[in-house]
């Protein structure tokens, strides 16, 4: 069970939301979970990574582009989703700058089965380097559902430093939605750690421009 009590969570969420109401921003502030680790050696210990799906999409403006076969491109077009077919990808001609630009333009990619294996050959390693290699899109999945799933999935990835941060929501979400998302994210993260809570030095949540609120 989580070492963060529900009361602590609710208090922190209230503070973050109140802070954002006091100082209105011209953009929707993201709420981030910041994690500081201890007893971990990024050089020796296995660097973990894992993804967890949250209940409510943390970033409504998160953009997903479909790299699709004919059917998926038609479905994407009907759903007004950005999409590219194999010909459009070939036109990028493995140009590093253009692939980098594509990786920057969207937050995530979905690719049809027939395309996904060809992506390294057509585009080179650009999407992978940007940490945006496409998720697989099959024909027995509903495109809209799959896009929602990608939008509400967050990734924990341990790099060379002992701190990491992930988006768990935004300030316009309800208290319950934020608390639920944070609870899911914290429990999942702790399950990835070798010694669970013994590896956690501190946990904070903060909005983009707000003050950090300590959870643990």
Curated annotation (Swiss-Prot):
Q: List the Gene Ontology MF annotations in alphabetical order.
A: RNA binding; structural constituent of ribosome
| One Gene Ontology term from the biological process aspect of the record | translation
Cellular component GO terms held in the UniProt record: cytosolic large ribosomal subunit
CDD domains linked to this entry: Ribosomal_L1
* Keyword NAD set for record: no
Classify the source by domain of life. Eukaryota
User: Main localization of the protein?
Assistant: cytoplasm
Q: Does the keyword Ribosomal protein apply?
A: yes
Give the coiled coil ranges.
Answer: none
SUPFAM superfamilies the UniProt entry points to: Ribosomal protein L1
Q: Which InterPro entries match?
A: eL8/uL1-like (IPR050257), Ribosomal_uL1 (IPR002143), Ribosomal_uL1-like (IPR023674), Ribosomal_uL1/biogenesis (IPR028364), Ribosomal_uL1_3-a/b-sand (IPR016095), Ribosomal_uL1_CS (IPR023673)
Q: Where in the cell is it found?
A: Cytoplasm
Segment forming the signal sequence: none
**Which keywords has UniProt assigned to this entry?**
Cytoplasm, Ribonucleoprotein, Ribosomal protein
What the entry lists under PANTHER family is as follows: RIBOSOMAL PROTEIN L7AE FAMILY MEMBER
On subunit structure and binding partners, the annotation says: Component of the large ribosomal subunit.
Protein family membership: Belongs to the universal ribosomal protein uL1 family.
Functional summary from the UniProt entry: Component of the large ribosomal subunit. The ribosome is a large ribonucleoprotein complex responsible for the synthesis of proteins in the cell.
What is the protein's given name? Large ribosomal subunit protein uL1
What is the originating organism of this protein?
Danio rerio
Please name the gene that encodes this protein. rpl10a
């Amino acid at each position: 069970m989580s070492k963060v009590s529900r009361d602590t969570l609710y208090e922190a969420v209230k503070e973050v939301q109140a802070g954002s109401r006091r100082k209105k921003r011209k953009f929707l502030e993201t709420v981030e979970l910041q994690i500081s680790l201890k007893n971990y050696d990024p050089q020796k210990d296995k660097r973990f990574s894992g993804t967890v799906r949250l209940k409510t999409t943390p970033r409504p403006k998160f953009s997903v582009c479909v790299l699709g076969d004919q059917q998926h491109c038609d479905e994407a077009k009907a759903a007004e989703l950005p999409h590219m077919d194999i010909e459009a990808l070939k036109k990028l001609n493995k140009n590093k700058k253009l692939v980098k630009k594509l990786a920057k333009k969207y937050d995530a990619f979905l690719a049809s089965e027939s395309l996904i294996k060809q992506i390294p050959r057509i585009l080179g390693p650009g999407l992978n380097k940007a940490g945006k290699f496409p998720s697989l899109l099959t024909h027995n999945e509903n495109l809209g559902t799959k896009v929602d799933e990608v939008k509400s999935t967050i990734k924990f990835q341990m790099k060379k430093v002992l701190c990491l941060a992930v988006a768990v929501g935004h300030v316009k979400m309800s208290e319950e939605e934020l608390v639920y998302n944070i609870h899911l994210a914290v429990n999942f993260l702790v399950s990835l750690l070798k010694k669970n809570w013994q590896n956690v030095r501190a946990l904070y949540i903060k909005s983009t421009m707000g003050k950090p609120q300590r959870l643990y």
